[in-house]
Amino acid sequence: MAYIYALIFAIVVCMNTDVIQAEESQHDTLENVEYRLSCIPKGGECERMADTCCPGLQCLGCNPFNKENLGKCKCQ
């Protein structure tokens, strides 16, 4: 009889763990979607020294030491 209770307890624990992991993965997915919607696509203007380009792109084409060269960077 103790084996049946232990088996039921193990099943309940596993089911609860799966639910918690599914909620965390959904939360991560929503954050990733929000980031992708707010990132700057390829060819878009970006601010120097800022990480606003979409994943896999970099803000290039400007001199970070020249204060007059603002707004000329592009996500590439």
Curated annotation (Swiss-Prot):
Localization: Secreted
Domain of life of the source: Eukaryota
Protein modification: Contains 4 disulfide bonds.
Signal peptide, first to last residue: 1-22
MF (Gene Ontology): calcium channel regulator activity; toxin activity
Keywords: Calcium channel impairing toxin, Disulfide bond, Ion channel impairing toxin, Neurotoxin, Secreted, Signal, Toxin, Voltage-gated calcium channel impairing toxin
Tissue: Expressed by the venom gland.
Gene Ontology CC: extracellular region
Function recorded in the entry: Inhibits voltage-gated calcium channel (Cav) currents in DRG neurons (IC(50)=1590 nM).
Entry similarity comment: Belongs to the scoloptoxin-13 family.
Protein name: Omega-scoloptoxin(13)-Ssm2a
Taxonomic lineage of the native organism: Eukaryota, Metazoa, Ecdysozoa, Arthropoda, Myriapoda
